[in-house]
Amino acid sequence: RQGEILTHGIAAMPGKPSLLANCRGRLVAGAPGYPVSALVCFKELLEPLISWLSHREPPAKTVVLVELTRTVPSRPGVEEHVRVSIGRVGDKLVATPLGRGAGNITTVTRAQGDVRIPEQAEGLNEHAVVPAELSVSEAELDRILVCVGSHDNTLDLLADELMGLPEPFRFAST
């Protein structure tokens, strides 16, 4: 016997198979193999733990209210973390859910934030106003163009051009 498992599994999706153990007096963390799951494990488990062990405050998180552009279904029983693309439309912030899945790494680079679906909920409704934790500065949200409708390959070309500007704009299409 090498040690003991302190906790295995958290009620979050992605990120469920996270692990903390004591191995010969040392704290050992086990992160899931899928990249998005590993990121959730770090943000929800390891970052607060490292802050606590180092006697420091956890990094400040910016939370804003966003209006969802579409319904986001979910299964009850786990808190789901959904990456969202956020942009300003008029005087409000709107959030479009991105693809889901523990291995969907492109959503991490395309997202400006995360929305949490509580573990007792079966999802969130279109037009619901919910908190979103930003992964970018709030000022960056004003440099995102939001496009709603069917996707066209021309939009990908436009997005590339906008990112190549001296002061880049992000392009978020739904």
Segment roles from a protein language model:
Residues Q2-S137:
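Flexible glycine/proline-rich
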Residues S137-T174:
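Domain-level signature for soluble enzymes in the chorismate/prephenate branch of the shikimate pathway
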